[in-house]
Amino acid sequence: MSKLRVGIINYGVGNLGSVQNAFAFIQTHFSDVLPHTLEIKVESHPERLQDYDKLLLPGVGAFGNAMTHLKNTHLDEAIREFVQSGKFLIGICLGMQLLFEQSEEFGNHKGLGLIEGKVVGFEHIAPLKVPHIGWNSCNFTPEGKHSKLFRGIADGSFFYFVHSFHIQTQPQFILAQCTYGYPFGAIVHKDNLFAIQAHPEKSHNVGLRLLANFLTL
């Protein structure tokens, strides 16, 4: 069995421990799904990103601070080069939002610009509270119904969310929607990019299955 090198990008604001634990669990419990053995590393050196077969961009916190960290460490350009090479990358939570063109969180900030669209705050609709915290169902769009990312995952499965902002993008990029007051794009796909607003590493078996599916793409 060949080895798949997976890099977890460390730029100072990521939820690295829980993501590492999730991949360790996947390697042990989803071996029947994976066509490769896994070599998982946390990576903070931009010049080494191209050494990996797949990358995961995690993140918690504020969009502007995260982009500042990426720029100061030159990881922003390294991520763009990795994606341009055709290799697969998945962003989770804040990591998802960073893939887009801009965010309105605490001002206007430019993102990585890899997916067309922007990040906006939730509308305050009583009695719903912001941030959106907890379990919520994700419903497949027509674009997502046959996605390999969802193999073994039922339509309407529940994922764990913690966020105050969400993405707005073109419908053809949205694989699944979640509703919190109104529908928003929860899981997206463009070319070799995937992203999920929820925390798959905290979403029990369904989230781990999604990450395992990503590794098989």
Curated annotation (Swiss-Prot):
Active site feature? C93 (nucleophile), H199, E201
Question: In the UniProt record, does the keyword Amino-acid biosynthesis occur?
Answer: yes
Q: Carries keyword Ribonucleoprotein?
A: no
Disulfide bridge map? none
Cross-referenced CDD domains: GATase1_IGP_Synthase
Single annotated GO MF: lyase activity
Task: Cite the annotated pathway.
Answer: Amino-acid biosynthesis; L-histidine biosynthesis; L-histidine from 5-phospho-alpha-D-ribose 1-diphosphate: step 5/9
Where are the annotated coiled coils located? Answer: none
Q: Name one Pfam family in it.
A: GATase
Q: Which residues form the Glutamine amidotransferase type-1 domain?
A: 5-217
Any one Gene Ontology BP term:
L-histidine biosynthetic process
Q: What is its main location?
A: cytoplasm
Annotated compartments: Cytoplasm
Q: Name one GO cellular component term.
A: cytoplasm
Give its E.C. classification number.
4.3.2.10, 3.5.1.2
**Summary of the function given for this chain in its UniProt record:** IGPS catalyzes the conversion of PRFAR and glutamine to IGP, AICAR and glutamate. The HisH subunit catalyzes the hydrolysis of glutamine to glutamate and ammonia as part of the synthesis of IGP and AICAR. The resulting ammonia molecule is channeled to the active site of HisF.
Q: What assembly does the database describe for this protein?
A: Heterodimer of HisH and HisF.
Question: Per its record, how is this protein called by name?
Answer: Imidazole glycerol phosphate synthase subunit HisH
Which organism encodes this protein? Helicobacter hepaticus (strain ATCC 51449 / 3B1)
**Which gene specifies this protein's sequence?**
hisH
